[in-house]
C-alpha cells in the first residue's frame, strides 16, 4: 500500500493487518518496552497540517519518533503559502528536501488524493474536508475490537452531524467492511441523502437508536451549525440528541461510548457520560482509551506504509 487516503474500498485483510500491528505497538507503548523501534530510522516525515489539530498531530509525531523518524512540522500560516505559493508547489519543494512521506490535513475534500497523485512519496490523509479521516476511524475500530473481541455482527450507532463528518464516513466504510452493522442518528438536516447506498440504518429518535446499539460513536457538533440554518438552537439539539445518563438509564444495558474529540460538554454529550471510565452506570467512556490507541494505530500505519520490511 503506497498511500492511506481513505477506508472506502480497502480490503478487510488490509484493515486487519493495521489493527494487528497496532496491538503490538500498543503493548510496546504502554509497557515502555523498546520505546524507540527504529524501523523508520533516517526517514523524514512532513506533518503538513492546513487545519488545527491536537490529538491527530501529536499522536502522529509521537508515532514517527517512536519509530526513529525525523518529523518536519509545517504551518500554512508561516509558510510560503501565505505568499501565494500553491499547495502542490509546496509539496514539491519539500520533496526536493528528501522528505519520505507526507501526513496531510486540509479543509478541502479530495486534497490528500490530489497530493497522492502529484508525488511519488507516501501520503497519509489526516482528514480532508468532509471526505474521510481514515486513521481516526481505524483507532475507533481498534478500540471497539479490543472491547468486543470481534466486530462481526456488532451494532454501532453514530450520533450527530453525519452530513459534514469525515469521521462518520470513514467509520461507516471500515466498520461495514469488518462485518459490523452501522446506524446513524441525528437531525434530518444533518443526515446525508446517500445513506441508503451505504447499507446503513437511519434513526430519527435517539432512544430508539440507543436501544438498538451495542456501542455509540458521538460526533462533535460544530457550533456554527446552530447559526447556519441546520438547527433551531444548540439547546434544542442537546435536548433531542444529547447523550446523557438519563437517556442511557432507559435502555438498561452497558454501552461503550466513543468520541473523536474535542468534545462540547453538555451539548452532544454530558460531562458524566464523557468522564465515566468504569461502572457503576450504563455507559463506559472510551475517550482517553481512543487517544492512547491513536498513537498505536498511527505507529502501525507509518511502519506498514513507509518501512519496506517492518520488524516483527
UniProtKB/Swiss-Prot annotation:
GO terms of molecular function: amino acid binding; aspartate carbamoyltransferase activity
Superkingdom to which the source organism belongs: Bacteria
List of residues binding L-aspartate: 83, 166, 220
Family annotation (Pfam families): OTCace, OTCace_N
Enzyme Commission number(s) of this protein: 2.1.3.2
BP-aspect Gene Ontology terms: 'de novo' pyrimidine nucleobase biosynthetic process; 'de novo' UMP biosynthetic process; amino acid metabolic process
Enzyme class: transferase
Gene Ontology cellular-component terms listed: cytosol
PROSITE patterns: CARBAMOYLTRANSFERASE (PS00097)
Catalytic reactions on record: carbamoyl phosphate + L-aspartate = N-carbamoyl-L-aspartate + phosphate + H(+)
Disulfide partners: none
Transmembrane segments: none
Quaternary structure and partners: Heterododecamer (2C3:3R2) of six catalytic PyrB chains organized as two trimers (C3), and six regulatory PyrI chains organized as three dimers (R2).
Summary of the function given for this chain in its UniProt record: Catalyzes the condensation of carbamoyl phosphate and aspartate to form carbamoyl aspartate and inorganic phosphate, the committed step in the de novo pyrimidine nucleotide biosynthesis pathway.
Name used for this protein in its record: Aspartate carbamoyltransferase catalytic subunit
Organism per entry: Prosthecochloris aestuarii (strain DSM 271 / SK 413)
Amino acid at each position: 500500500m503506497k498511500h492511506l487516503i481513505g477506508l472506502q474500498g480497502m480490503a478487510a485483510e488490509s484493515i486487519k493487518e493495521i489493527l494487528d500491528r497496532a496491538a503490538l505497538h500498543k503493548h510496546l507503548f504502554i509497557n515502555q518496552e523498546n520505546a524507540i523501534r527504529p524501523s523508520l530510522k533516517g526517514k523524514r516525515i512532513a506533518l503538513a497540517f492546513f487545519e488545527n489539530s491536537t490529538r491527530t498531530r501529536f499522536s502522529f509525531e509521537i508515532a514517527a519518533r517512536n519509530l526513529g523518524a525525523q518529523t518536519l512540522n509545517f504551518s500554512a500560516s508561516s509558510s510560503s503559502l501565505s505568499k501565494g505559493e500553491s499547495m502542490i508547489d509546496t509539496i514539491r519543494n519539500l520533496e526536493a528536501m528528501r522528505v519520505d512521506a507526507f501526513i496531510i490535513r486540509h479543509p478541502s475534500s479530495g486534497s490528500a488524493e490530489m497530493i497522492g497523485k502529484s508525488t511519488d512519496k507516501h501520503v497519509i490523509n489526516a482528514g480532508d474536508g468532509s471526505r474521510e479521516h481514515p486513521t481516526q476511524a481505524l483507532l475507533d475500530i481498534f478500540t471497539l475490537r479490543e472491547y468486543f473481541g470481534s466486530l462481526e455482527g456488532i451494532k454501532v450507532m453514530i450520533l450527530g452531524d453525519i452530513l459534514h463528518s469525515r469521521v462518520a464516513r470513514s467509520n461507516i466504510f471500515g466498520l461495514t467492511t469488518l462485518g459490523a452493522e452501522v446506524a446513524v442518528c441525528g437531525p434530518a438536516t444533518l443526515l446525508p441523502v446517500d445513506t441508503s447506498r451505504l447499507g446503513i440504518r437511519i434513526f430519527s429518535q435517539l432512544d430508539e437508536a440507543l436501544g438498538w446499539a451495542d456501542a455509540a460513536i458521538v460526533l462533535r457538533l460544530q457550533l456554527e451549525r446552530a447559526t447556519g440554518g441546520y438547527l433551531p438552537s444548540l439547546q434544542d439539539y442537546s435536548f433531542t440528541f444529547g447523550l446523557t445518563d438519563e437517556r442511557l438509564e432507559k435502555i438498561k444495558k452497558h454501552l461503550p461510548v466513543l468520541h473523536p474529540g474535542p468534545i462540547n460538554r453538555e451539548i452532544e454529550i454530558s460531562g458524566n457520560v464523557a468522564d465515566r471510565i468504569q461502572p457503576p452506570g450504563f455507559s463506559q467512556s472510551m475517550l482517553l482509551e481512543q487517544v492512547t490507541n491513536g498513537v498505536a494505530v498511527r505507529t502501525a500505519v507509518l511502519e506498514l506504509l513507509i518501512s519496506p520490511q517492518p520488524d516483527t
